[in-house]
Structures are given as structure tokens and as C-alpha cells.
Amino acid sequence: MNPIFALPQADWNSLMPEIVLTGVASLILLLEAFAPRLRPVFNGMALAGVAAAAAILAQQPAGLYFHGLIESTALTGAFSQTILLATAIGLLSAQGYLKRERLLFGEYPALLLWCATGLLLLVRGVELVTIFVALELLSVALYGLAAFHRREAVSSEAAIKYFLMGALVSSCVLYGAALVYGETGSTSLAGIAAALAAGTGSPGLL
């Protein structure tokens, strides 16, 4: 059996907030493509997804999941709920602007939900590769949001500049993670801390 599917149910439950947000975002994009007449309800769908993710997070027990890739604590729970609250505020506060600019498309709530997904993984990730993947998910969604106003040249310009800066920063983060792994032999934050505390490698280089 594939080891991914052999994971305990608790591991999958720990990712349920991200799964819910990703599922709702994907559904909104499908409806945008095949049933655009439903655009008025997309924002409500996104808010329902955020509320569901918040409810799941509130009931999530503390612990390490996915072989130590993700951690749930009271602190990560508080940050995650703050992220979801900010996402809900972003969905509600943008409605007037989107209507005024005639930009009520499904991509906006979908991209915002993917931003929230990346942020949740970033908050709860305790391993360098997980953190990097979360950062990239967040960045790709933000590139789309930066270019969302298709009729404005400044929006496209901002997206291009952000993409170039994001590519540079991603390269630096990945290179730094490779150096840390080379010095400590671990991508886990706990393993890195233990290696540095033991005095192995060259902490000054890091």
C-alpha cells in the first residue's frame, strides 16, 4: 500500500482546514468556468469555506502530524484563526471595489482562499521543505491577485515586479535551506536546533 494512504486518520484530519479551503477554491474556479451565472454566490461560498476551516481548527488537538512536518499548538491555532479572520475581512471588504470596477469574478475569492491555505501551512510547518512549499503556494496566489485588475497597466506592472522579486527571494530561501541542511543534516526545525545546540557544523556560517 502507498505509505501516503497508510497514514493515520489524525494526520489527514490535521490538514482538513487546508483541504476544505483548497476544495472550495477549486469548486469556485470550476463554477466560474462552467456556470458563470453563479458569480453572485461565490463570495458566500468562500466565506462558508473559511468558517468551516475555522470550526475544524478550533477542535483540532495539539500534536505533530505527517511524521513531524506539521505541528498544531495553541499558538499556531491562534495565528491560524487570525489568518482566517483576515481572509474573511478581505472577502467582505473587497466587494464594493470589485463591483465598482466590474471585477466580480470567481478568481478573486479562489486566489484569496489559496493565500490563506499557504499561510496556514506556513504557520504550522516545522520542516524547511514544507515551509518552502507553503511560501510558494502563497506567492503564486499573490501574483494572481496583484495582476487581478486586468484593465489597469499598473496592476500588470506590479505583478511582474512582484514575480521577479519573488523569484529572487525564493532562490535565496532555497539556497539558505540547502546550506542549513548541509550543516545540520536535518530539515526539521527541531533537528536543526538540536544540531546547533550540540555544536555540530559551523553555526557562524549559518
Q: Where on the chain are the PLM-derived regions?
A:
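Alpha-helical transmembrane segments of multi-pass membrane proteins predominantly involved
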Residues: 1-206
